[in-house]
Amino acid sequence: MHDELIKRCYALARSAVAHGNHPFGALLWKDGQILMEAENTVVTQLDVTGHAEINLVRTASKRLDPETLIGASLYTSTEPCIMCQGAIYWAAIPRIVYGVAGSSLAELQGAAWYTPSRESYQRMGASIEVTGPVLEEEGMEIHRGFW
């Protein structure tokens, strides 16, 4: 199941690039169905907070009741950055599944921004289940082609 949903996130990441944005996509999953999807919109919306996970959490928080969020899983093409980790925490989404590890992307970009999700949530005392990487090489191909 994880593979299929991560592949959908990779399709969203490719769509984000086609729309002129950065290669990231995310979806919300519960009870065997995709509740909603989001892409990165940083470039087209001129908004540095327009990460796929933030866009997803922002929309989900407005449209779904808290009980739905509490029982959902967030799938994302790449491990969430620290900003997105915080949004997921505050939305009370208990599970994250990611494709590409943040450390792999940071290494590709030569960046030092990476904070592991598991480490962040442990420091917060949050019981958010983190699974990943899943199909990482497929996701890295998207990033290599972009960055």
Language model features by range: what are they?
Residues V43-D47:
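A glycine-/small-polar-enriched, mobile loop at the entrance of the PLP active site in fold-type I
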Residues M1-H19, P80-M83, A87-W147:
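Zinc-dependent deaminase
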Residues V42, T76, V100:
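Residues that line or immediately flank small-molecule/substrate-binding pockets and catalytic motifs
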Residues E4, Q33, N55:
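Active-site phosphate/pyrophosphate-handling residues
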Residues L35-V42:
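Short beta->alpha transition motifs characteristic of CBS
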Residues T49-G50, I54-A87, A91:
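Helix-adjacent hinge/juxtasegments
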Residues C9, A13-A16, A26, A52, ...:
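Small-residue (primarily alanine) positions within well-ordered alpha-helices
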Residues F24-G32:
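Short beta-strand scaffold segments in enzyme catalytic cores
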